[in-house]
Amino acid sequence: MTTQQQATPSGGAEWQQRPERSSLFMLRLMTWLSLRLGRGASRVVLYVIAAYFLAFAPTARRMSRDYLRRVLQLAAPAAVGWRHLFRHFLCFASVIHDRIYLLNGRFELFDIRVHNQDLIDKVVADGQGVFLLGAHLGSFEVLRAIGRQQPGLRVAMAMYEENARKINAALGAINPEAQQDIVALGHIDSMIQVHELLGQGTVVGMLGDRSLGQDDTRAFDFLGAPAELPLGPFRMAAILRRPVLFMTGLYRGGNRYDIHFEALADFSKVPPRGRTLAVQAAMARYAVLLAYYCRSAPYNWFNFFDFWHAPQPRPSRSPEKNQPTP
């Protein structure tokens, strides 16, 4: 795997500038129907949602085609057929649909299998705060389900403020009683809040595959081409001197999810002068693990934007507030 040594401003803000497709009214309606009709009957609507994206979301369709060509190792985007695209959108709709049941405590509906559980068990036993670094790959919600079932495992999420606002709104639409710890990043006291949670033994989850336009990034080989990854999550873990686990909850079809934990990095004993190299090594391993699990479950990738975009120049002034993203 190759790396670019200099920090580059990310063009990943594209995902922020898209108009919000989701409607809280529709989400509430879908939640109402799903909880009353049951998971099996309400899944019929998922085919309609997948067909809608296939027909009326050209950007998502194009990005899906580009990603699938890379992960399936096909010769050209044209080799990705409508069947591949429909399956990709259907997997996305299925995971969003299952979130309704997971947030409402309907864990008995699912077959959730945990791999390398000893890694997270050790965290709980030691009372040690740790970072969980995931991606828009599969479902993070299944981890929260495990957290509610396992005494002593408290999970919080650290994310950008706009995402935090939308997640809270979505949670309220799905289940107003759902308790969710979310730390909005980008404030002066954000790192202090994260530090306090870690000190209480909380597992703090972050997603390491998207950034804001003004964020520093590093470029790593991902599925055969350079892709920019945000430096922020890794830098925070290094500054706070905490271990980091990679986590993904892959949807395998039917009612089955596989949660995978992998040791990613341990910054607890890294001196300040060694942070740069340690962060670089952690990001390199993250890119390798992300590619590995993408190949393991190719239709679980839910980054429907140009992930392999060319770097854009850093703006000379503060960027205007971006529009929300789906």
Can you describe what each PLM-predicted range is?
Residues 2-134, 170-172, 177:
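Membrane-anchoring hydrophobic helices of lipid-metabolizing enzymes
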Residues 2-3, 37, 53-56, 74, ...:
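Non-catalytic C-terminal accessory region of glycerolipid acyltransferases
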Residues 14-15, 49-50, 105, 155-157, ...:
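A short, structure-level motif marking secondary-structure boundaries and short turns
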Residues 29, 119, 142, 190-193:
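Well-ordered alpha-helical segments embedded in enzymatic catalytic cores
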Residues 76, 84, 95, 126-187, ...:
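Catalytic core of membrane glycerolipid acyltransferases/transacylases, capturing the structured
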Residues 110-113, 137, 164, 184-187, ...:
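A conditional alpha-helix N-cap/helix-loop micro-motif detector
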Residues 115-117, 158-160, 185-187, 262-264, ...:
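Conserved beta-strand termini and adjacent loop/short-helix elements that scaffold enzyme active sites
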